[in-house]
Amino acid sequence: IAHDLFNGTLGIFEQGYDPYLSLWDPISHWMSVEQALYAIVDRPEFVREMLSRMVRGYLSMLDQLEEQGLLCHHQSLIHCTGAYTDELPSKGFDPKKPVAKDIWMFGLAQMLTTVSPDMFDEFEIEMSMPIFERFGLVYYGCCDPLDRKMKQVKKIPNVRKISVSPWADEEMSAAEIKSDYVYSRKPNPALLAWPEFNEDEVRKHLQATVDVSARNGCPLELILKDISTVKYEPTRLSRWADIAMDIVGG
């Protein structure tokens, strides 16, 4: 059906499975977030064993996907951002049988926002490392502010993009990211939801991001996401995009 609709306009091709391998999102369904956070303190061995079993399960799933040639390849997106790179696919790539080293993965642990950097390192970064290392490249983060946990995120050897959410301190984030990673900024979408669309506020907000990334030599991308409403004015989206392009010199 897609081929019939878009033939001649868009290239249509079959794709395999694009893995989403979060440890903590499934846990939030099995236990409440509150119970899981208490368990880290009260039952750390239980939590470590639960995470270890999940990691073993994910790695086994990847083994099966690779063996059967069911993984995706040539991703256009990785967790709402462009999957642009000249580092992938890996050497020896076989489009009929792609492997995890040919593609991006994304990691996140939003429910660990309130834990210390050391706990984040122990229960997320170190536990997830076998999964991270299995893939070609890693995009890390979502809505969780990582400004005080950048040192831990940077331990991931193949991380290339790091999320800078609306709740993150941009100065701290940029000082850690520098030119080593993509500064994947998620500007505040609330500016599109006000009763009156204030273009000056949008410009000020975006300019601050461009300035801090420029001062620290950060490669920058702007990702507008998590939009709740545009107050029945979809033109706010195009105006936001126009302002962003004007600021970055596009």
Predicted regions and their residues:
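Active-site loop segments of alpha/beta catalytic cores
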Residues: 1-250
